[in-house]
């Protein structure tokens, strides 16, 4: 049979015109055209059949993410227009760092939307727009629906998720990611079937969010090939010596690749990644 591709046009609602990256404002690298190019290519191939996602609600999201992050993203853009100024894109001015409040008692989410932006977001390239929350919810529905197709008996499926997800941690958004689509789907499989799940991440950047979410769990393995964080985003995570902790010790495998890695070296690393999946 044909491979089912789950796609939602809701991703078009997240359409920022600018991002702040490398000390400059420019048009976003993560834009609607990325997903549309994939859609057009697959739609022209008879091997694929397009289906729409089902609505899964917020429960799969809050199984993985802090409810405060969900609540914030649902109103943040509108709150900013009301409380700060009218702005097509909304980004933080300041980020919370734990040592700002070292020895000063419990951390508390700020009341102002400017404070909340820096509380829930970790970098500047991920603007909120009027439709971002709806698009992010749609991407979760796509991931969950594609996963359910396999749970219902299909050999495979493809979830065309946008916005992406693997940089979103349990309580932070950033790196173009709002909710961690793959982590939400992997958790759903692990909990509904009782079987071990592996997330194999082959994006150029390390999936810091997916790693963080499953770092102390042994029911979801995280395996990642990525550019060496000594020189590549997200810089702070993705090192080979990081392998999980507690029950999750040994369930994380990072394979950082040096600059100018050729095809043979990449395939060798991919083979190592696949052999680790059990």
List each model region and its residues.
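HDAC/HDAC-like amidohydrolase catalytic core signature
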Residues: 1-200, 204-278
């Amino acid at each position: 049979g044909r491979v089912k591709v789950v796609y939602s046009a809701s991703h078009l609602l997240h359409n920022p015109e600018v991002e702040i990256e490398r000390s400059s404002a420019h048009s976003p690298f993560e834009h609607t055209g990325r997903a549309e190019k994939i859609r057009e290519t697959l739609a022209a191939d008879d091997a694929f059949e397009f289906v729409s996602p089902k609505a899964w609600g917020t429960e799969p999201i809050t199984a993985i993410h802090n409810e405060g992050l969900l609540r914030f993203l649902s109103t943040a853009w509108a709150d900013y227009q009301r409380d700060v100024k009218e702005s097509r894109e909304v980004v933080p001015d300041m980020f919370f760092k734990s040592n700002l409040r070292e020895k000063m008692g419990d951390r508390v989410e700020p009341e102002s939307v400017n404070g909340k932006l820096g509380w829930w977001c970790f970098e500047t390239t991920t603007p909120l727009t009027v439709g971002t929350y709806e698009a992010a919810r749609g991407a979760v529905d796509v991931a969950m629906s594609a996963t359910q197709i396999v749970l219902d008996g299909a050999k495979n499926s493809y979830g065309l998720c946008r916005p992406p997800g693997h940089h979103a941690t349990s309580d932070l958004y950033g790196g173009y990611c709002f909710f961690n689509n793959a982590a939400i789907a992997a958790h759903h499989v692990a909990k509904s079937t009782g079987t071990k799940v592996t997330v194999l991440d082959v994006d150029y950047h390390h999936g810091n969010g997916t790693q963080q979410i499953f770092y102390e769990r042994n029911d979801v393995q995280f395996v990642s090939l990525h550019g060496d964080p000594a020189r590549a985003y997200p810089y702070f995570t993705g090192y080979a010596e990081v392998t999980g902790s507690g029950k999750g010790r040994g369930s994380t495998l990072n394979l950082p690749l040096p600059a100018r890695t050729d095809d043979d070296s990449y395939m060798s690393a991919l083979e190592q990644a696949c052999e680790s999946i059990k």
